[in-house]
Design a protein with these regions (language model features):
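Short, well-formed alpha-helical segments that are part of the catalytic scaffolds
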Residues: 10-24
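Acidic helix N-cap motif at the loop->helix transition within catalytic regions
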Residues: 14-16, 41-50, 75, 99
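A conserved acidic beta->alpha catalytic loop
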Residues: 36-46, 66-67
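Glycine-rich, basic loop-to-helix element that forms the pyrophosphate-binding segment
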Residues: 64-82
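Short beta-strand-to-loop acidic/aromatic patch adjacent to the donor-nucleotide binding site
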Residues: 83-95
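Donor-binding/catalytic cores of nucleotide-activated saccharide
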Residues: 92-201, 206-225
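Catalytic core of nucleotide-sugar-dependent glycosyltransferases
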Residues: 205-211, 218-247, 259-289
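Membrane-interface aromatic/basic loop that binds lipid-linked glycans or pyrophosphate carriers
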Residues: 267-332
């Protein structure tokens, strides 16, 4: 059985399309667990009506006090079917491809018992969309392709992955509660620490709606740089544990600085306040320049590196502002 856990919070606008999506699933080998995280709108009423009319033992609806997405997912994990072999986590404002899920348990039988299954996905920007393709197929060890998967942003989210249920149960893995961002990434790193192999399917499992108001690309995140630093340290630990060769991991500090600027642009802070925050992060990168491998930096990042080394934060600010050197790297 494949289990799908979907948290809901004030999701009345998304419930109709979610219901349509769920109806396309084959409930003979799939269960869906909807967790209402203390919604204040009509989410509960809409889902209750659907549950009563659909009448399937493999469609569960759980109400709980508001505690955040991690709390809701953890409640879902506590209520999965004992027969569950694999599970995944979706968001209610996105879209999943039911035909891929319906055939998953059949297709997985042709592979040698993977711990984690990685899919491609589609990123929807409203008017246009982009297919994110890992260009992999089959089973491989984590050390083979981890760096590519991490730097391309495919490791970070949960919704492009299917996890072996037994590994989560045996290792008592849960989402960290009480944090404002990065809960997917932290869970994935913990899962990868106990995983042996990964399978990649060439099909797209999921459509992530970047145009959603809840998308991290639309919100100012005060702790975004700290999250990036934490992520780099955790990846470094994972690489040591798994014997993954990633000598230029600290080059990601440049990426973190670029991302910080892009996120500051979303804030309502004054120009002075933005400069203060940016300079704090700039100073951290400058103090860690000795860890950066300049030979593997892109031409764009070498310019940023040069400004950091010369202690010219205002030049970076101007470069970001007027030449648009950065490309925001989303991690929902």
């Amino acid at each position: 059985m494949l289990s799908i856990i979907i948290p809901l919070y004030n999701a009345e606008l998304h419930v109709p399309s979610l219901i349509k999506n769920i109806k396309e699933l084959d409930f003979s080998n799939i269960e869906v667990i909807l967790v209402n995280d203390g919604s204040c709108d009509s989410t509960e009423a809409l889902v209750t009506d659907f549950i009563n009319s659909f009448n399937s033992v493999n469609l569960k609806f759980i109400n709980k006090r508001n505690g955040g997405v991690s709390s809701a997912r953890n409640v879902g994990l506590q209520n999965i079917n004992p027969k569950s072999l694999y599970l995944t986590f979706f968001d209610c404002d996105d879209w999943f491809y039911s035909e891929v899920l319906n055939s998953f348990l059949v297709e997985i039988q042709s592979l040698p018992d993977p711990d984690l299954v990685l899919f491609n996905y589609v990123r929807n920007f409203g008017v246009i969309s982009e297919r994110i393709d890992h260009k992999l197929n089959g089973v491989f060890s984590l050390s083979e392709n981890f760096v590519m998967l991490y730097t391309s942003g495919l490791i970070q989210p949960c919704w492009n992955k299917v996890y072996k249920t037994s590994l989560i149960k045996e290792n008592h893995l849960r989402f960290e509660e009480g944090i404002s961002m990065g809960e997917d990434f932290r869970f994935n790193i913990s899962f990868l620490e106990v995983s042996k192999n990964v399978a990649a399917f060439s099909s797209s499992l999921y459509q992530y709606n970047s145009d959603s108001a809840n998308s991290l690309t639309k919100r100012f995140l005060p702790d975004s740089f700290e999250y990036f630093k934490y992520g780099i340290s955790k990846v470094n630990e994972l690489c040591h544990l798994k014997g993954i060769d990633y000598p230029d991991i600290h080059n990601r500090y440049i990426t973190a600085l670029k991302d910080r600027f892009r996120n500051l642009a979303l804030s309502t802070l004054s120009y002075k306040e933005k400069n203060i925050l940016f300079y704090e992060d700039f100073s951290f990168v400058r103090n860690n320049l000795d860890k950066i491998k300049t030979g593997s930096l892109s031409p764009q990042d070498r310019i940023i590196y040069m400004f950091v080394r010369l202690n010219l934060p205002k030049f970076i600010w101007l470069a970001f502002s007027f030449h648009r050197l950065i490309k925001f790297e989303s991690y929902k």
